[in-house]
Amino acid sequence: MKTFSSFLQIGRNMHQGNQTTITEFILLGFFKQDEHQNLLFVLFLGMYLVTVIGNGLIIVAISLDTYLHTPMYLFLANLSFADISSISNSVPKMLVNIQTKSQSISYESCITQMYFSIVFVVIDNLLLGTMAYDHFVAICHPLNYTILMRPRFGILLTVISWFLSNIIALTHTLLLIQLLFCNHNTLPHFFCDLAPLLKLSCSDTLINELVLFIVGLSVIIFPFTLSFFSYVCIIRAVLRVSSTQGKWKAFSTCGSHLTVVLLFYGTIVGVYFFPSSTHPEDTDKIGAVLFTVVTPMINPFIYSLRNKDMKGALRKLINRKISSL
């Protein structure tokens, strides 16, 4: 992390030269009243703990149960890791700021936070698309599943997803550190996000916004299209199953993932395609909370409640811990 911050500082100095630049940002958060701050602290601390524990249990259960050592659950374990990392990237700093009554964050820390927020949003998107394809193969081509979705292929897809996420985040970061912020350093947000930072800059952000639009649209459209057509084929295949038990088994395999997909893209449509024209800053905050806090917290419940294999693995893990006491 220190090396990354040093890299940001060097890059910033190269592009900005001797011009006066800011050294920190002020995060305004949600409310200014102290009583609201205390409520926010308790609320976000609770959601943070639930998210870390829930997703952590999924990762441990998958790693300990050899039956779940398949590409399907490799993707789920990585999604849980990304969810833990996503909420840990923003919420702890916000909680510290509330307790210390300090709203400042250094320039390097802010850009680093922005970098990782992009990584985790993109990886979530890519993993959801990859998981949809995995479910398509499992339901529509069950006899060829072990051939089409070999463990090495699952690992390759995971590595590619993480690689692309970091490349996209690095691209936005390298473009951002070339911008000047003059004397404007107040962010109407609870963490450093790309869109509010671009609005704050006093430089020309046309290239940044163009790259954000093109890359962002590509990152959304490709996984969404893959998920959409995968589930169209899955639904058609399930409807052709004659037995009720067979239909239920197919639904339990992909139902939890479909719920997460609908939640994820429903959030995108609701927040970014139908934004509030009167309070655009509130829209940014709502979108950030849904992506970085609410969705990561809900995901473990969806996967554990609606996935038979996952429920069995979690039950084994809990029983093992109880018996060891």
UniProtKB/Swiss-Prot annotation:
GO CC annotation: plasma membrane
Superkingdom field: Eukaryota
Sequence similarity: Belongs to the G-protein coupled receptor 1 family.
Keyword terms: Cell membrane, Disulfide bond, G-protein coupled receptor, Glycoprotein, Membrane, Olfaction, Receptor, Sensory transduction, Transducer, Transmembrane, Transmembrane helix
Pfam families with a match to the protein in the record: 7tm_4
Gene3D superfamilies: Rhodopsin 7-helix transmembrane proteins (1.20.1070.10)
Primary gene name: OR1S1
Glycosylation: residue positions: N18
Protein species of origin: Homo sapiens
Segments crossing the lipid bilayer: 39-62, 71-92, 114-133, 153-171, 209-232, 250-272, 286-305
Protein name (Swiss-Prot/TrEMBL): Olfactory receptor 1S1
